[in-house]
């Protein structure tokens, strides 16, 4: 069953402050001001609805959308209707849209982006008044905290919402406020509901591994941390965030989720439960490996202090203590379930593994800058990307479609795309290949290609590989559950991947984002035996780790709660891994457990607001570029190289600290000023500060290794960086022409230079606002920049008028009709220009021009005339205006008109014997009924 997204309000705290924290608004007004967002459903939203007695029948909602679609279809054929009929249809459409809005809108749940601590304190102390109702803080999940966002709820129901979502936990059990925030916030995770499974909770399993590390000891204040290589013995939780699910329960959930396959892994959510379930034949294991015994220990104890036993024949899900965050706040599973039932809390699945993995992995600069690559390696790595972009051409329509719409298409998929409510200009291209002559469509394709090239300069190139779920050996897991000493099916240096085994690949490079240090590339030797094929047979996808190494430490402290791992078999990348690099380790601070108060919660919020992870990642990129520059000039055996290298390790530690910042509820060390701030040294300063000769020497040294310059390729990441670079080059270009009467490029390429020219170039590079060396990413960037993809000649932006007859209706409009369309479209163009950026990946601003479109149609009284007015507005009278608005407003009706002229389309489909080559696969053009 499809579930539409829920509409909620979202404000910036500065807006609330401007109006004295009191705002009165309607849904339509809030939507026009971009203060309405759409969120996937969650337990928190379901609880609020239940308290309010509001039930959303999502099947009924689909009927509403179908009814609205029916009215749209009638309007699309309104050339044959009377003016009165059109007005009735428009009115009915407005009424059903209002019903949809009313059904999906939840005014009790509002998100606020906190822009100052004073705003936060005011909202927590006094609340905000929205439409006459008082709202106070309800929650702040870890993800929301990183974006300085809180959820507020109306005072009318907030106490009951908290009481239900607290789910009867034992409040006398000490708990860190920051942890509680994160656990309580899990109820706002987007989930699809599934039936309650029969489950047990088991203890986690830990063992140790001894290995050598770069150990970081934090030094307070404006100083580098101490980094020393030493051997350590570290305990690892092999079941961290992971549980098991039987194939029969996995099949049941798959059916409930509307899937035609059994996912190898499911994400899991329930009150204070979070993690991943791996599909594994737990009952078969008990029968064959555990000697037919199904009796196992659970985590709970009876009154005599003995572990309560469970018969696994009666259960289908095994949950670890690390998944059940507050297991010790309940007497047992029955107590927990009783509370779940009383509070009407449902089991949910946020995500699940796909039926098939992709065959192409998009790399990124973090993955690439941490490799040992030379110029030839860069060319080889970029070859598939260059060939991919070079293949896009006006003359190769089939390739163009694959570039625009992707691969793995089916007839059903093409039809679903044609019926969907977005990308209408692309639909027009599919319906009629002649639309490739449209200047607007060509400009869209040109922009897309240019964007792909720019992203390529940033490291977004393609290699064989994909992302898969990280899994801890489920065979060893079941051994642990059954009380058998875990040996697993994988040795200390073994890993498993069905995907790669099917392709005969025995070694891959594993990478987990965000990737900061070289050791986070792990060469994985893949194992395949009759035993692995039998017991891992439900893991069609997923990367299985052994229970004996320290791989999770290399992967930045990964766990198994649905973390994903990138793997590639690309030989250049595998060769480029620093195979003997040590991983980073530090003593991470632990949060204080206590009976927390509201004040503790507020402190935890404030500590967790904002994130400087991006800044730390940038500093590591700066350091990699600087390290390459130092190597080129001075080699590795010098203090400059050693300190810069040490800072890369410290960046890794700082990033880990920032990720855990919200969990521990206190500030962590970030980037020392010593790394980025230039310290002036003149005679007066030296005298006034009393600097010794050694002090001056040290200051000069640290000034020489500042991480204050972005690498060259970052000009494609930040517009400001590009502007500074371009301005600097222009100034020096002019100076070069004035001084030497030649271009800068010519001067650089001169074999023999005068002392003055050498000095000019030395200064040019010294004061360059970016680091210009041969680091892997800088080389890659310059290589792609140097290729002439001939976009202008392949995708020319010719005159568009020839395509207008392809999209117009057979209808004549009047001047009065045009003026109606002109007025409304002009308003929509202003609104489109002012669209804000309030959202993140999990939410989207609700922008809907359909009511404006219907208004034009109803006032003109004819869809054909209305569409033709709009087409002429953009193509005849205002050709420079943004045609995105034309397709947003009238795309549905243009496509309906085009579909009447064609019953089939031709589309490139996967075909092993096909004659169309694209990204290493073959396709053939096939007829598709629409």
Language model feature labels by segment:
Residues 1-556, 572-575, 594-930:
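Conserved small-residue
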Residues 564-567:
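A short beta-strand element within the Helicase C-terminal
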């Amino acid at each position: 069953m499809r579930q539409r997204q829920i509409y909620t309000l979202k404000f910036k705290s500065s807006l609330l402050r401007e109006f004295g924290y009191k705002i009165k608004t309607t849904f339509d007004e809030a939507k026009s001001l971009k203060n309405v967002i759409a969120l996937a459903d969650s337990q928190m939203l379901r609880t609020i609805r239940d308290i309010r007695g509001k039930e959303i029948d999502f099947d009924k909602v689909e009927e509403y959308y179908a009814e609205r679609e029916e009215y749209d279809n009638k309007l699309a054929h309104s050339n044959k209707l009377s003016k009165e009929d059109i007005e009735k249809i428009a009115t009915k459409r407005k009424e059903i849209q209002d019903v949809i809005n009313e059904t999906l809108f939840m005014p009790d749940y509002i998100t606020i982006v906190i822009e100052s601590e004073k705003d936060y304190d005011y909202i927590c102390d006094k609340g905000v008044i929205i439409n006459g109702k008082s709202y106070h803080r309800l929650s702040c999940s870890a993800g929301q905290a990183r974006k300085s966002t809180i959820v507020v709820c109306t005072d009318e129901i907030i106490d009951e919402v908290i009481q239900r979502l607290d789910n009867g936990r034992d409040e006398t059990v000490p708990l860190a406020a920051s942890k509680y925030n994160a656990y309580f916030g899990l109820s706002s995770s987007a989930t699809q509901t599934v039936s309650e499974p029969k489950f047990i909770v088991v203890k986690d399993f830990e063992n140790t591994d001894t290995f050598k590390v770069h150990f970081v000891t934090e030094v307070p204040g404006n100083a580098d941390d101490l980094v020393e290589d030493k051997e350590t013995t570290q305990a690892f939780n092999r079941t961290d965030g992971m549980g098991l699910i039987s194939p029969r329960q996995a099949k049941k959930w798959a059916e409930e989720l509307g899937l035609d396959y059994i996912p190898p892994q499911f994400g899991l959510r329930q009150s204070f439960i979070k993690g991943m379930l791996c599909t594994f034949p737990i009952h078969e294991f008990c029968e064959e490996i555990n000697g037919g015994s199904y009796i196992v220990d659970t985590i709970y104890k009876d009154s005599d202090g003995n572990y309560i036993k469970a018969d696994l024949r009666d259960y289908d899900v095994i949950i670890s203590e690390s998944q059940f965050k507050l297991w010790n706040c309940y007497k047992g599973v029955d107590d927990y379930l009783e509370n779940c039932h009383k509070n009407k809390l449902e089991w949910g699945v946020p995500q699940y593994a796909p039926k098939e993995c992709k065959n192409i992995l998009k790399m990124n600069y973090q993955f690439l800058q941490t490799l040992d690559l030379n110029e030839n390696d860069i060319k080889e790595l970029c070859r598939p990307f260059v060939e991919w972009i070079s293949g896009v051409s006006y003359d190769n329509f089939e390739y163009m479609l694959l570039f625009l719409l992707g691969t793995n298409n089916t007839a059903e998929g093409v039809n679903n795309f044609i019926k969907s409510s977005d990308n209408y200009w692309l639909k027009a291209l599919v319906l009629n290949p002649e639309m490739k002559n449209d200047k607007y469509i060509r400009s869209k394709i040109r922009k897309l290609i240019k964007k792909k090239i720019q992203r390529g300069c940033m490291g977004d190139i393609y290699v064989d590989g994909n992302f898969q779920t990280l899994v801890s050996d489920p065979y060893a897991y079941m051994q642990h559950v059954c009380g058998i000493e875990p040996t697993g099916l994988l040795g200390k240096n073994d890993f498993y991947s069905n995907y790669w085994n099917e392709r005969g690949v025995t070694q891959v490079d594993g990478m987990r984002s965000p990737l900061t240090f070289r050791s986070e590339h792990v060469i994985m030797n893949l194992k395949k035996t009759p035993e692995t094929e039998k017991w891992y047979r439900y893991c069609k996808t997923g990367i299985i780790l052994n229970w004996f190494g320290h791989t999770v430490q290399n992967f930045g402290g990964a766990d198994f709660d649905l973390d994903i791992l990138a793997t590639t078999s690309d030989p250049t990348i595998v060769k480029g891994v620093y195979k003997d690099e040590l991983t980073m380790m530090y003593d991470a601070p632990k949060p204080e457990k206590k009976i927390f108060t509201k004040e503790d919660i507020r402190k935890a919020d404030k500590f967790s607001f904002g994130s400087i992870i991006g800044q730390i990642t940038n500093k590591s990129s700066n350091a990699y570029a600087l390290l390459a520059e130092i190597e080129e000039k001075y080699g590795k055996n010098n203090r400059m190289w050693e300190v810069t290298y040490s800072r890369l390790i410290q960046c890794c530690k700082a990033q880990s600290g920032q990720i855990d910042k919200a969990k521990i509820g206190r500030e962590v060390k970030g980037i020392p000023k010593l790394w980025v701030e230039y310290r002036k040294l003149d005679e007066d300063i030296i005298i006034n500060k009393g600097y010794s000769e050694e002090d001056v020497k040290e200051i000069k040294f640290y000034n020489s290794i500042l991480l204050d310059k972005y690498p060259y390729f970052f000009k494609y990441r930040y517009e400001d960086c590009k502007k500074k670079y371009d301005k600097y080059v222009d100034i020096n270009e002019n100076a070069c022409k004035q001084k030497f009467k030649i271009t800068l490029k010519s001067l650089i390429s001169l074999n023999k230079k005068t002392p003055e020219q050498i000095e000019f170039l030395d200064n040019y590079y010294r004061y360059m606002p970016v680091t210009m060396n041969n680091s892997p990413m800088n080389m890659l960037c310059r290589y792609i920049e140097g290729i002439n993809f001939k976009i202008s000649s392949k995708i020319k932006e010719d005159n568009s008028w020839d395509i207008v007859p392809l999209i117009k209706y057979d209808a004549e409009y009047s001047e009065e009709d045009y003026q109606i369309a002109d007025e409304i479209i002009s308003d929509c163009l202003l609104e489109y220009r002012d669209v804000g950026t309030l959202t993140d990946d999990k939410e989207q601003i609700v922008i809907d021009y359909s009511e404006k479109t219907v208004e034009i149609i109803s006032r003109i009284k004819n869809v054909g005339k209305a569409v033709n007015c709009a087409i002429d507005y953009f193509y005849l009278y205002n050709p420079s205006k943004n045609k995105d608005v034309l397709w947003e407003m009238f795309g549905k009706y243009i496509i309906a008109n085009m579909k009447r002229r064609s019953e089939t389309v031709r589309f490139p489909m996967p075909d092993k014997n096909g004659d169309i080559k694209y990204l290493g696969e073959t396709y053939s053009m096939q007829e598709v009924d629409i």
